[in-house]
Amino acid sequence: MTARLRSVRHALPRMTTKSRQISAASANPIRANNKEFLPQTSPARNYFLFLFTPPVPGKPDARSGIISIANRWTATRYTRYREHSGSTKLLRSLPGFRDLPDRIRTSSLAEMQRTELEASESKSIRRACLSGLVVAYAFVAWLAYLNYVIVVVAHIIGYASTVLAPRWVRAAGVLFTLCALCASLLLCRSNAARVHAVGKLAAPLLLTAAAALCLVPLCAGVSVVIAMVVLTAVAIFFSSAVICHQMRPLLRMSQGAVWLFLDMLLLDLAVMVNLKLSEQTSVQLIMLFGMVPTVMASFDPAAMLIDTTMFKRQVCAKFGTAEPYVCAQRRIYIPGLQIDKNKSADAWQEDPMQERDSQLTGETLKLGTAACACPFSVVLVLFAVDYKCIVETVVPTLGLGCVQAAAGVSLGFTLLELTGRNRYILIAACGVMSLAAFACVACALLSVLVTSVVLIIGTIFGAMLIAHGMTILNDPRRADDERQLGFFLVMLALLLLTCGHQLTTIRY
């Protein structure tokens, strides 16, 4: 009797479970048609059954009512699982996963692996794109902040791309790039006003020293020193110019791009024409291309471009600002023009007189750029027509004119700093030197007297003229027409220094 009751007691749960299966099957036709159906153990098992079991044709689909709930539950849960580990191990560890049929387990694992693979691929692509953008932005920002590096690299590419260039040119280019970078980074760490003054004075003086070294008979050591001085001077000038401008990154990048275009145009044209010049002329050619930025130190063509009204309007429209500069751009700082000698450059910048527009018009700047570029355009034309005999004569003379102009600019700014308190002495000296300079120019044009004395006097005259023109140009009490007169004086000095008596020595 006891054994019989025990058998009945054990049979009751099985009957109850079977009845529950029948009731569940009657409520869900999909479960009724699935022979591999097992008792419910977890919500995950129900989800996989609803998701991967195909509906029976002709019968209502039980998934239509609860599929959205299952999707929401699964999306939340699997998102949490993927955030924690992102692997299929958690899928295998879900309650009731092992109780699922093999077909459902395999398909679910494959689906999860495919999802994880797509997610990892998209994540790696996003990381690669983000890393590339960060590197590109850092590189562009670095070039924008130190855009003189573009010019130095352009020089090296131009030197290394020609087979005719001597080996010392390539070696010196790499060596001088490192020297120029170190010097410029040191300058960037110091005060901006001091950097600007040092760059304006040191770059032309270094180029003048390079020209003096050219008079020494060429040897390996002298050639390296020449290239080092030239590239260091260019780097110093550009570092000071970039720090002084205080422009937005887009403007700095535009300035660097303009210089890159100009320099690569000159260098690539020389390579394409493939002129077989002598070593002395090659050195002069290197110096000529290295001095182009320094001769036009006060009149940067890229700065002229971004100072035009059209460019400023486009930048303001792009950024939605009223001023394209990060802060108000400083005018040329001349101590002699200060009323209060103890005022700094920042305090002088806040002067109410500065509210006047001190920028020249874009048309006048374009004319000045064209006038400055005339002698270099002549060199380009000579390269294009392949007149080697003329190039042998023109390049050294124009190189000498560039050195003279660089020395004149340097001396002019030095006079501005030293004679700030005695402007009348400067004006009187300019008048005296004007008479002497016109006499020297007349002698040079008549080929009566072309000696080193003429070079010295012409350089001093150019320096005085530049100093006087800059004084007029920067005086806020003068009208705009008078300021343009100062601009004209500076341009005239540069033209006389660059292509004065040198053009008279060309032999056709």
Curated annotation (Swiss-Prot):
Keyword Transmembrane helix: yes
Keyword Magnesium: no
Topology term for the membrane: Multi-pass membrane protein
GO CC list: host cell membrane; membrane
Localization of this protein: Host membrane
Domain of life: Viruses
Transmembrane feature ranges: 133-153, 168-188, 197-217, 218-238, 253-273, 286-306, 365-385, 398-418, 425-445, 446-466, 486-506
Keyword line: Host membrane, Membrane, Transmembrane, Transmembrane helix
Family listed: Belongs to the alphaherpesvirinae HHV-1 UL43 family.
Protein name, per record: Membrane protein UL43
Species the sequence originates in: Psittacid herpesvirus 1 (isolate Amazon parrot/-/97-0001/1997) (PsHV-1)
Gene: UL43
